[in-house]
Amino acid sequence: MTKNLDSYFKGKRALVTGGMGFIGSNLAIRLARAGAQVTILDSMITDYGGNEYNLAPVKNEVRINYCDIRDENAVNYLVREQDYVFHLAGQVCHLMSLTNPFPDISINITGTAIVMEALRKYNPDAIVVYTGTRGQYGSAVSFPVNEEAPTNPKGIYEISNLTAEKIIKVYNDVHKIRSVLLRLSNIYGPRSQMKHSRFGVANWFVRLAMDNDEIQLFGDGSILRDFCYVDDTVDAILRSAVTEAAYGEIFNVGSDIPVPFRELVETIINVAKRGSWKFAEFSPERKAQEPGDFYSDISKIEKFVGWRPTTSLTDGIAKTIEFYDAHRDHYWKKTSTEDKTVEAAKLAPAAKCQ
C-alpha cells in the first residue's frame, strides 16, 4: 500500500450495515473522517447493540437510515451507487440463538442474501467486506487456527455466520461481486453496548470492574483467547477493502498472542484500579458450549493485506476504560426494565467467552 489508507476512501461512497453498532460505528467514524460519503443502515433492534450516541462525533457527516436489511425495497435503493458495502448488520449473540434461532436465520442468512442479491441487480461493481466470527470454526483442532481449519460451529449463531459467508462467496465467485470475508476474534473497545453480558466478554468484564463488582472466572482461568482492539479491527476492514488480492479470500482478524482469561481479568482490574474476581464452576450447559482454547493465525491477512494489530492488551483496555469513564451515561444509562436486566446479568454466570 503506497499511500495513506484513509486517502483511498476520500470522496468514495460507503454503506455500513449495522452502522450504529459496536464495530460498525467505529468504522463509520473512521470513514467519515477520511472524507467518505457514509450511509448507515441500522434497524436499531432493542438489545442488539445499536446506540445513536455511537455516531455523535460524525452525526452531521453521515446519512442514517433506520431500516432492516430484510427490507428488500430499502436495500435495493441503498446499495445503488455505493463504492463499498461493509456488511456488519446481524444478530450477534451466541446465547440468544440457543433459545431463539429464528432471528439468526432471518437476519444473518436471509438478510445477507437480500443484500447480495440487491448488489447483483443494482450495483455489481461495489466491493463488499463481511465480518463473521471465529466461532465458525468451533473447537480448534490445532493452534494457532488458520483459515484452512475445519469449520464445525457449535451454535446457530455461528452456523448463520458461516452460511452468510458462503452466500457471499458464491456471489463473489459466480456473479463477480468482489468480496472479502473476515472472521473476527474477540473484539473489544469503545462503543460496545454495556447494558448486558450477552455481547463480548472483554467489554462486559470492563463494566464489572468499573462498577467495582466481582468478575466470575469459570474453570481455572487458563482458557486461551486472542483479543483485538476495535481500532485495529477497523484498520483490517479498511485495508482488506482496498487490497485487490484480498477479494474472494477469507481472513482471520485477531491476535496471534494468546491470553489466558485470568490474565485478561487481572489486566482489566489493574488498569481500572477497581473490581475483583473469583473462580466459579462451569454449569453443565455452559461447559457443553465452551469450545476451549482459541487463538488466531493471522499470517494470511498479514501476507495479503499487510495488516497486524498494533494495540497491546493493556493499552487497549486503558483506552476502553478512558472512553467509558468519559461517556458512561450514554452506555450505563438504563430504563427500569434494563436496570433489572443488568442486575440479573451480574448475578448470572459470567459473560459468554467468545
Kindly label every feature range from the protein language model.
Residues 147, 158, 196-199, 295:
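Short, conserved loop/turn and helix-capping segments at secondary-structure boundaries
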Residues 97, 149, 179-194, 204-228, ...:
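A conserved pocket-lining segment of Rossmann-fold NAD(P)-dependent short-chain dehydrogenase/reductase
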Residues 52, 203, 234-238:
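Short alpha-helix within the catalytic core of nucleotide-sugar-dependent glycosyltransferases
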Residues 27, 33, 67, 210-354:
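C-terminal substrate-binding subdomain of Rossmann-fold SDR/epimerase-dehydratase oxidoreductases
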Residues 1-187, 326-327, 336-348, 352-354:
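N-terminal Rossmann-like NAD(P)+-binding domain of SDR-like oxidoreductases, especially those catalyzing
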Residues 46, 193, 197-201, 260:
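Short acidic-hydrophobic sequence patches enriched in Asp/Glu that either
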Residues 99-100, 142, 156, 192-197, ...:
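Short, solvent-exposed loop/turn segments at secondary-structure boundaries
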